[in-house]
């Protein structure tokens, strides 16, 4: 965690935020995609960003090349996440998104990857020093944590720039403990 927080390129996070904000100002939308565990992360981040002021949609990593790319329009932004940055199915989705006129923000642990090269902005979620952890050092543990932290940093920048009020947040998240206005917020 410390390595990810220290190595995160805040300037590039700012560039990613600007790309998204420009798209939203022009009635574009943000989509988040990944394959496997990063696909689950994409669903979480899409929900988080949507509830905190940035219209965001989950884009299924493989279904996109089987018709779901119809949700993409020119000017949209797609965040694609992959530790290796070379996942074949994800790269097919990224190329499809680019052909549909979308800008790409790549989240990867590999700055020399296909994803990094295809992206308009690349955010590095590096786990080279720590590896993945666990007995086989293969299951995506640390890479998912690093990708989550980088995307959460981006979500904080977007939420701050959107100036989301407690009342607006509750409109997007009306139920549960988070959906109640606190006495100090009224």
Predicted regions and their residues:
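An N-terminal, well-structured beta->alpha segment
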Residues: 1-26
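Internal, active-site/partner-interface "lid" segment
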Residues: 117, 130-135, 159-186
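Amphipathic alpha-helical interaction segments
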Residues: 15-18, 40, 173
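Catalytic cores of large soluble enzymes that bind and process phosphate-bearing ligands
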Residues: 5-8, 12, 37, 142, ...
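Glycine-rich phosphate-binding loops that contact phosphosugars or nucleotide phosphates
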Residues: 21, 29-162
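Generic macromolecular interface patches on structured domains
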Residues: 4-7, 11, 30, 125, ...
């Amino acid at each position: 965690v410390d390595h990810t927080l220290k190595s995160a390129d805040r300037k590039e996070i700012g560039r990613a935020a600007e790309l998204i904000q420009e798209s939203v100002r022009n009635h574009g939308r943000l989509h988040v995609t990944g394959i496997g565990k990063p696909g689950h992360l994409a669903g979480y981040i899409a929900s988080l960003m949507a509830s905190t002021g940035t219209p965001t949609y989950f884009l299924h990593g493989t279904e996109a090349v089987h018709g779901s790319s119809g949700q993409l329009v020119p000017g949209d932004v797609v965040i694609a996440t992959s530790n290796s940055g070379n996942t074949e199915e994800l790269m097919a989705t990224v190329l499809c998104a680019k052909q549909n006129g979308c800008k790409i923000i790549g989240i990867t642990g590999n700055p020399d990857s296909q994803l990094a090269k295809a992206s308009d902005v690349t955010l590095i979620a590096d786990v080279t020093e720590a590896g993945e952890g666990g007995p086989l050092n293969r299951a995506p543990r640390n890479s998912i944590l690093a990708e989550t932290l980088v995307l959460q940093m981006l979500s904080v920048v977007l939420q701050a720039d959107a100036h989301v009020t407690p009342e607006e947040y509750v409109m997007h998240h009306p139920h549960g403990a988070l959906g109640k206005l606190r006495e100090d917020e009224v």
